[in-house]
Amino acid sequence: MHSPHADKGNALDTVAHKTLTRGWQAELDLRFTRAAHKTVLTSARHVGPLTVQRPFYPEDDVCHLYLLHPPGGIVGGDELTISATLATDSHALITQPGSGKFYRSRGPQAQLRQDFYLAPQATLEWLPQDTILFPGANANIQSVFHLAQESRLLAWDLLCLGRPVMQETFSHGTLRNRLEVWRDGTPLLIERLHLEGGSLHTVARHPWSGTLLCYPATEKMLDGVREQIAPLGDYAGATLIDSLLALRFLGHDNLLIQRVMRAVWQSLRPQLTQKPPLLPRIWQT
């Protein structure tokens, strides 16, 4: 497991760092612990334009947190690093008020690295809004979940290639997207998506691509998910391997995808956490 920092209490340290040649170098390090009857964000250290809003508690004990990406999106040369560590018995739900955006690059790569470290009995719901890849973007995204045997995870990774609402396809650009799940140092899932030169053959020319993860899951949960994703058609499926449920889809209709993904989350959450599916307030605005 990732060793916690030595500092204690609430920490919110900010240092802006941008260079003319490399863009933003931004970091965000979050630490969650269980204190008394609720999960507390004990440390939120950030460098550059990555930050969070003040935590709130619509269901008393779970820490709901909104992650704020750089204003105006991510451009070539930006390097963003996000790390979240959840101590034993903590439970955090992290989402975003808006879509992540990777804009057209004149050459330099934009990098986003996200690491999540869950102690035994820790629960993470990682539910960001979709990430939009503008035509001409050059993006390298890596998301890694480090679990213990008794951790609980409910997460998704939603990508929008181009701006289909504006009739813009991902006609040129590069995307390297890597998604990993490890349990006690053993890989449960390593998934790669590589798009080069605007070619969308890998995704059968669908502008929407995504994965939903649930751990630990059961055959009953898998059967329920397979029923719920039927409206997405032939380009959606779900598997259960080593207690990790992975739902994958390609699609054209963002409203249908959003509706199905939220319905799956609403179904899985009570089974995984014994808590009702309370929609994040920001989703309803």
Curated annotation (Swiss-Prot):
Q: Main location per UniProt? A: cytoplasm
UniProt lists the gene as: ureD
GO annotation, cellular component aspect: cytoplasm
Q: Respond yes or no to whether keyword Chaperone is given for this record.
A: yes
Q: Which Pfam families match?
A: UreD
Protein's recorded name: Urease accessory protein UreD
Described function: Required for maturation of urease via the functional incorporation of the urease nickel metallocenter.
**One GO MF term, please?**
nickel cation binding
| Subcellular location(s) of the protein | Cytoplasm
Q: How does it assemble?
A: UreD, UreF and UreG form a complex that acts as a GTP-hydrolysis-dependent molecular chaperone, activating the urease apoprotein by helping to assemble the nickel containing metallocenter of UreC. The UreE protein probably delivers the nickel.
